[in-house]
Regions:
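Adenine-nucleotide phosphate-binding core of ATP-dependent small-molecule kinases
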Residues: 38-88, 123
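Glycine-rich phosphate-binding loop plus the immediately following alpha-helix
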Residues: 1-25
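Conserved, helical-rich catalytic subdomain that frames metal- and/or nucleotide-binding sites
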Residues: 18-38
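Acidic-glycine-rich active-site phosphate/pyrophosphate-binding loop
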Residues: 43-53, 99-112
Length: 138
């Protein structure tokens, strides 16, 4: 984000991304196939930044960066549990404050048959966990 948007302030990136259109930067299944594939809707991402060009707006790029990060996290979580029974994932940390979480993760839930949970105060859960770990050792 620092190179493309000249900022690394996640609040500013989120605000810029609110006006972005992900279909202007990400190649979607519907762009390469005229009908849904089995278990793969036309709005699913085929290629992150696959449609980005010099005409992409700052807002579209910001949204693309956020989607790339969130889809990578979600995809890694799903892949890590592929051969096991885990189907529920709890998301914590500052990234859960991105409004795009409520776009990206529900779509991934439908595609992969999993559930992503964002608990209250998710942005503080990492610090709470560290404090509890410290207290349990001392």
């Amino acid at each position: 984000s620092r190179l493309l948007l000249k900022t690394h302030d996640f609040r500013q990136i989120a605000a810029i991304a609110e006006k972005g259109d992900i279909t202007r930067v990400n190649l979607q299944i519907g762009d390469i196939c005229n009908r849904p594939l089995p278990d793969l809707p036309v709005h699913a991402t085929a290629s992150l930044f696959g449609k980005a060009d010099s005409n992409a707006s700052q807002e579209d790029i910001a949204k693309g960066i956020i989607y790339m990060v969130l889809q990578t996290i979600g995809g890694a979580a799903v892949l890590s549990a592929l051969n096991g029974p885990i189907r529920d994932f709890v998301l914590i940390g500052n990234l859960t404050k991105f409004p795009q979480c409520h776009e990206v993760f529900p779509n991934m839930e439908k595609i992969y048959g999993v559930r992503f949970h964002i608990p209250p105060y998710a942005e503080y859960r990492t610090a709470i966990g560290a404090a509890l770990a410290y207290l349990s050792k001392h």
